Amino acid sequence: MGIGKEIRLERIMNRETRKTIIVPMDHGVSSGPIEGIVNIREAVEKVAEGGANAVVLHKGMVRAGHRGRGRDIGLIVHLSASTDLSPRKNDKVLVCTVEEAIRLGADAVSIHVNIGAEGEREMLKDFGYVSKVCEEWQMPLLAMVYGRGPKIENQYDPKVVAHCARVGAELGADIVKVPYTGDPETFKLAIEGSPIPVVIAGGPKMKSEREVLEMVQGAMQAGAAGLSIGRNIFQAKDPAKMVRAMSLIVHEGKSVEEAFEILK
């Protein structure tokens, strides 16, 4: 890895722990202005003050989300998009370039690929192209890889998740985001098969905050490099406190019980 990528990665990860708490806020394209990100600047402010390492935004939200004050936070510009209104919502297309992201001040870029989807061929082609350009510009690449399509019966199947993680590594990502399998033992398959850092996705909004923290702890026990969780952070009762609680687990190795005290 070149020094350019190393320097930029330190802006989206904790330099001491080499772990990260990333909060995606790119849901506006896929689902509209959902609860928690209606006002993007306020949403960024809350998670930044809580200690998140980075946020994921689409290019048009960078200016809207820039605070110009308070605690600094890493910026990851998302390059992929589709909407929930599409009959082929699993087929992501590129809507931004690495060069655009650089001009916007990004510390990294992210791409979304759904293996098994009808549009897999084009998404993999885009992935390969983006990773090439990222290497040229020394821009870190976060790959969000999911198993979604006619042949995927369960996207949380350990073998499917491990396949997703390996695809991210094979095609040149620097960090890969995949679903959590449900327990540390099976999630280790994804960790062991990936030579790059693996972070977990948060998925749909969970019923309880304790459940979210238990998922985070399980992933960390398996060897994850952190998390990339959206709705279970920005739709929490207090997003800043939720990030602080997660930080205790991710960066300090604390227990769920210790982390949960912050949320009481």
From Swiss-Prot:
Originating species: Aquifex aeolicus (strain VF5)
Function comment: Catalyzes a transaldol reaction between 6-deoxy-5-ketofructose 1-phosphate (DKFP) and L-aspartate semialdehyde (ASA) with an elimination of hydroxypyruvaldehyde phosphate to yield 2-amino-3,7-dideoxy-D-threo-hept-6-ulosonate (ADH). Plays a key role in an alternative pathway of the biosynthesis of 3-dehydroquinate (DHQ), which is involved in the canonical pathway for the biosynthesis of aromatic amino acids.
Reaction catalysis annotation: 1-deoxy-D-threo-hexo-2,5-diulose 6-phosphate + L-aspartate 4-semialdehyde = 2,3-dioxopropyl phosphate + 2-amino-2,3,7-trideoxy-D-lyxo-hept-6-ulosonate
List of residues binding 1-deoxy-D-threo-hexo-2,5-diulose 6-phosphate: 26-30, 146-148, 202-203, 230-231
Keyword Glycosyltransferase: no
EC number(s) recorded for this UniProt protein: 2.2.1.10
NCBIfam families, per database record: ADH_synth (TIGR01949), PRK07226.1 (NF005556)
GO biological process: amino acid biosynthetic process; aromatic amino acid family biosynthetic process
UniProt protein name: 2-amino-3,7-dideoxy-D-threo-hept-6-ulosonate synthase
Keyword Amino-acid biosynthesis in annotation: yes
